[in-house]
Amino acid sequence: MVGALAAALLLASPAQTATVRVPVANVWEAPDAGHLPLDPHVWPTTAVSYSQRLALVGHMPTQVLYGERVRVLARQGGWAKIVVPDQPSPLDARGYPGWVRSWQLGAAFSAPLVVTAKVARLPNGMQIGFGSQAPAGVLPAAATRRLPVTRADLVETAKHFLGLHYLWGGLSRWGYDCSGLTWAAYRAHGITIPRDADAQFAAGRPVTLTQMLPGDLLFYEHPVVGHVAMYIGGGKMIEAPNSRSEVRIVPVRTTDFRGVRRFLGV
């Protein structure tokens, strides 16, 4: 009874703003990820085997990067229940929900700049990646330069990660899932779209295949919408397909095709 009361009080306390203070914090469905064969102190910034990547399916829906703000709703046994405001989701109007290890969070800093270089190094030696955030003046200007908001530049940003291993829930230069790749590419250009493929499909403006332009997103269903790719022109698309594959460019597929959605110039 006492434990249940304590948990209820934690959940009832006002949400606090915190900032991720590790290169990548994995967001878990529940605070029981200790059984997975991963060392949170070094992963995912080290090599991950296929079996380890497969073990994430259904357990780790997303990630948050260094400097990204989260709202802490509760703390429980070394874990923090959070929502991520910059990752819109129908699961919670406040942002993508999940659990991270409490030690991966710290005090928020003001006026962060988004890292648009593939990798950058903080003064303390920590290596952070594309999409992370850091206070102004901490990194060289070239590492946080503002990217133009054009279709061609959006496609080039996605192409930076060709050959990168697919990672379920991945949202960093160490691995993307399908919607993580599209979310990260758009966000680098100042456009926030929902985190998951089905939510991206629901939020975008419908266009036809004949109207499709580079940067538009193509969606596929099996049987519900569960995969997204970005059109790059010339009848081709870039995608992060599955745990056995890497980010790749392939011809546009019509099998299981559900529709095209537009976020740029809607």
Where are these regions (language model features)?
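Bacterial N-terminal signal peptides
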Residues: V2-L10
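Short alpha-helix capping/helix-loop boundary micro-motifs
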Residues: R53-H59, V119-M126, F201-T208
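Aromatic- and glycine-rich peptidoglycan recognition patches
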Residues: W43-P44, T144, R205-P206, I232-V266
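Catalytic cysteine-centered active-site loop
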Residues: H165-L213
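Catalytic nucleophile-His microenvironment captured as a short glycine-rich beta-strand/loop
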Residues: L217, G226-G235
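Boundary regions of SH3-family modules and the immediately adjacent low-complexity/disordered segments
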Residues: A12-D39, A55, Y66-E68, Q76, ...
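Short, basic/aromatic beta-hairpin or loop at an interaction surface
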Residues: P31-Q52, F109-V119, A185-A199, I232-G235
